[in-house]
């Protein structure tokens, strides 16, 4: 199994990230993708990934919350990081109209620029979309034939949005959100509709600790070592063998991010 979304640069992991990685290995997680969310965090993610060659990789990009920071100097930093061996995707980039920490216009500029960069460098994109599906798709579609792969990280959309993403050939990242009986039931019901070759699994650690995890860590902090729980639950809801699903989603991650 492969965790395609870990925020290992979070301050929550600052004191024990090495132990976090070791616990993931001991739990049977075979690889980790560390998420970059702005220029500084992308550098930190790349630095961490380089400490674990062949086990950790990273993305480099600017999250829509930080889109107001996008400028030529930031693009150059992202471009430079993208040339390093441990960086395998542009992102986390996209649109988030839920809280608009950056204006929609700023988000669209940063998103489009990063799609162009991914196309130029022939890198996959690691995507974020919240409350912005139609505009997200409008901006993404013109670039899809120029980009080797696209992953919708932490998908939480509805049935129509899932169908649209699947029809475009996007890979779908599923987190412990589906383990939340308060807000994840609708998405849980959609899990069997995702073709296995388009399914990826992730923790989004330290966030989104699965609510049905028992026992829960005293810290209430999510970690990649809990990915096996997500695999088990998703497999049960899809009526598939968890070992098989863990292997298939690991293969998918390595194919999408060209780690094979």
Curated annotation (Swiss-Prot):
Listed transmembrane segments: none
Top-level EC class: hydrolase
CDD domains per record: TatD_DNAse
Main localization category: cytoplasm
Compartments (UniProt record): Cytoplasm
Signal peptide range: none
Pfam families in alphabetical order: TatD_DNase
GO CC list: cytoplasm
Cofactors that this protein relies on: Mg(2+)
MF terms (GO), sorted A to Z: 3'-5'-RNA exonuclease activity; magnesium ion binding; single-stranded DNA 3'-5' DNA exonuclease activity
Enzyme Commission code: 3.1.11.-, 3.1.13.-
UniProtKB keywords: Cytoplasm, Exonuclease, Hydrolase, Magnesium, Metal-binding, Nuclease
Positions annotated to bind a divalent metal cation: 92, 128, 153
Superkingdom of source: Bacteria
SUPFAM superfamilies in the cross-refs: Metallo-dependent hydrolases
NCBIfam families, per database record: PRK10425.1 (NF007745)
Assembly description: Monomer.
Function text: 3'-5' exonuclease that prefers single-stranded DNA and RNA. May play a role in the H(2)O(2)-induced DNA damage repair.
Family, per entry: Belongs to the metallo-dependent hydrolases superfamily. TatD-type hydrolase family. TatD subfamily.
Cross-referenced HAMAP family: TatD_exonuclease (MF_00901)
Full protein name: 3'-5' ssDNA/RNA exonuclease TatD
Gene source species: Yersinia pseudotuberculosis serotype O:3 (strain YPIII)
Organism classification: Bacteria, Pseudomonadati, Pseudomonadota, Gammaproteobacteria, Enterobacterales
């Amino acid at each position: 199994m492969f965790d395609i979304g870990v925020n290992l640069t979070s301050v929550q992991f600052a004191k024990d990230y090495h132990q976090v990685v070791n616990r993931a290995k001991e739990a049977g997680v075979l690889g980790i993708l560390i998420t970059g969310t702005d220029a500084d965090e992308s550098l930190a993610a790349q630095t961490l990934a380089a400490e674990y060659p062949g086990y950790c990789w990273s993305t480099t990009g600017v999250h829509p919350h930080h889109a107001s920071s996008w400028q030529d100097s930031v693009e150059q930093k992202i471009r430079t990081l993208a040339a390093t061996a441990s960086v395998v995707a542009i992102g986390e980039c996209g649109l988030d109209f839920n809280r608009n920490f950056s204006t929609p216009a700023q988000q669209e500029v940063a998103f489009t620029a990063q799609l162009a960069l991914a196309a130029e460098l022939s890198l996959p994109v690691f995507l974020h979309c919240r409350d912005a599906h139609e505009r997200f798709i409008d901006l993404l579609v013109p670039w899809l034939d120029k980009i080797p792969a696209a992953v919708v990280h932490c998908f939480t959309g509805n049935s129509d949005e899932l169908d649209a993403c699947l029809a475009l050939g996007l890979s779908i990242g599923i987190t412990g959100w589906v383990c939340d009986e308060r807000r994840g039931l609708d998405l849980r019901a959609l899990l069997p509709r995702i073709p296995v070759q388009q399914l990826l699994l992730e923790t989004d650690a330290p966030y989104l600790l699965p609510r049905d995890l028992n026992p829960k860590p005293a810290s209430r902090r999510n970690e990649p070592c809990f990915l096996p729980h997500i695999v088990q639950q998703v497999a049960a809801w899809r009526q598939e063998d968890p070992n098989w699903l863990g292997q298939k989603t690991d293969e998918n991650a390595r194919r999408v991010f060209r780690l094979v």
